[in-house]
Amino acid sequence: MVFRLANFDFELPPDRIAHRPVRPRDAARLLCVQTSGGCFGYQPDHVYHGVRPCSGHASSRPGHETGGDRKNPQDARLTQDSAQPSNQLPGDGRNLARIEDRVVRDLPDLLCPGDIVVVNDTRVIPAQLTTRLGNARIIITLDQPRAEGTWHALARNARRLHEGDKLRFDGPSDLSAVILARDLDGGVILRFDQQDAEFDEALRRDASLALPPYISRPHGPEPADATDYQTVFANNDGAVAAPTAGLHFTPALLTVLEARGILRAFVTLHVGAGTFLPVRSDDVSHHTMHAEYGEISASTAHAINDARAGGGRIVAIGTTSLRLLESAVDASGMIAPFAGQTSLFILPGYRFRAVDVLMTNFHLPRSTLFMLVCAFAGTETMRAAYAHAVAAGYRFYSYGDASLLYRYDR
């Protein structure tokens, strides 16, 4: 099947790009999008045959309207087609999709006791280094470690670099490396002279956060970014970019989720710099997905499987958690322990086996992440939902608002 890159394009005004997060974090807006239920009381059919949705949810019968006492008073109205009800979007195949404008702190009202939210506990490391070759300033962004103390990295002005070049990086630590190899996508393999604890300390002193290129920081990251660009779950060093859906959570929100009987599990996927690389193939099925290292412990796999067996939905917080879970699931929907690289590339037509609900930020046009949400909730549904988000003033990308999506193939 041919998937044209242009099919995943959309117009995004520059003023919709968020350059700083809202405060508090859980005050960010949350766009619920579902085809056969979800924010309106959806329960997965593999568990809830004939069982009434949990308390506080409206019926999942087709055409049932959301409860007025729970509707956001700031509800934005669709502008694409005035003939459609304000909470309906074009659907993919069987059903109309419906939306609801909420805020992140409403999440406990949108989930049920026994659901399990799966969060990525990776911690962002300072990974951007600068050096000079002659008069040229070279920016190196570490991507992921390789064998024997080497790193794969992305290099700006990579054409100036050659195998065997010795790089001495700016900063007080005298950090240095030699280029072992180059690849065609601006990547290099580096061997640093410093190793282990000495290398980690040098990074802390000499490197800066590798903020996404769409976040405007003319003079580099600001002091607030050191905390703003980490999730409350951050525990395991290794990511170059934040798992941004997790940025919306606060201790207060977690307390309410726990009090409602909503479970939580931790996985680790170290988000690499490759997440920022554009898709260059017109037929996107030819795109080579970057690999990232992830882990799911045996206890986490057991907790997720138990939640599903007990009737709970698997709620992935972010595309990183989703891709890792889908990399570790078998044909029956059981999660196995996992430790290794994943380069799973999800396009429309993919059959999801692990995840029922996805919370994720709003993504770039033509990106692999927008392709993923189209696969999860339906391409036409997501194109219409993003058009609604633009018209309603939602904030996009890493520091922006979030969406709550439900698998339309159920």
Predicted regions and their residues:
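Surface-exposed, charge/polar-rich loops and edge strands
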Residues: 1-38, 95-410
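Short Gly/Ser/Thr- and charged-rich N-terminal loops/segments
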Residues: 13, 56, 80
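N-terminal low-complexity, intrinsically disordered patches enriched in charged
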Residues: 32, 65-66, 70-72, 76-77, ...
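Intrinsic-disorder-associated, low-complexity terminal segments enriched in Asp/Asn/His/Tyr and depleted
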Residues: 42-48, 69-75, 81, 87, ...
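Short hydrophobic alpha-helical segments enriched in small aliphatic residues
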Residues: 47-51, 58, 65, 76, ...
